[in-house]
Amino acid sequence: MLIGILSKKYVKEILELLNEKGELHFSQIHKEIPTHMSSLNRTLNELVKLGLISKRKEDNKQALPKTYYKLTPLGKKALLLYEVEKIIENSKNNQNIIIQIINGKNHNIINAKIVNIHNK
């Protein structure tokens, strides 16, 4: 589930890193993300499985080829959810928020009205 993975530790940092730097190999990501290699590997594999990042292995004759990761278009859209979260957290308690998300593929505008449920 997308929301579940986005709330996991270091996922936001990984997505933002790949968005900023482009394609990186595992050790480059590990250098920036302060976690155990096994935890990072597990998280990256989950992100690949959900289609938020893509994975490719370097095509060469090395015994251990480098694995590269890159943010996908879906991953870029997922980063928008962190922005929505920030807007909601920064809003006043009694304020209604209208969020417009533009779908770049077919330019549909999706309006979502988020009402503060505490006032109801």
From Swiss-Prot:
Domain of life of the organism encoding this protein: Archaea
InterPro entries reported for this sequence: Tscrpt_reg_PadR_N, WH-like_DNA-bd_sf, WH_DNA-bd_sf
Pfam families, A to Z: PadR
Coiled-coil annotated residue ranges, if any: none
Family note: To M.jannaschii MJ0361.
Full protein name: Uncharacterized protein MJ0944
Species for this entry: Methanocaldococcus jannaschii (strain ATCC 43067 / DSM 2661 / JAL-1 / JCM 10045 / NBRC 100440)
Lineage: Archaea, Methanobacteriati, Methanobacteriota, Methanomada group, Methanococci
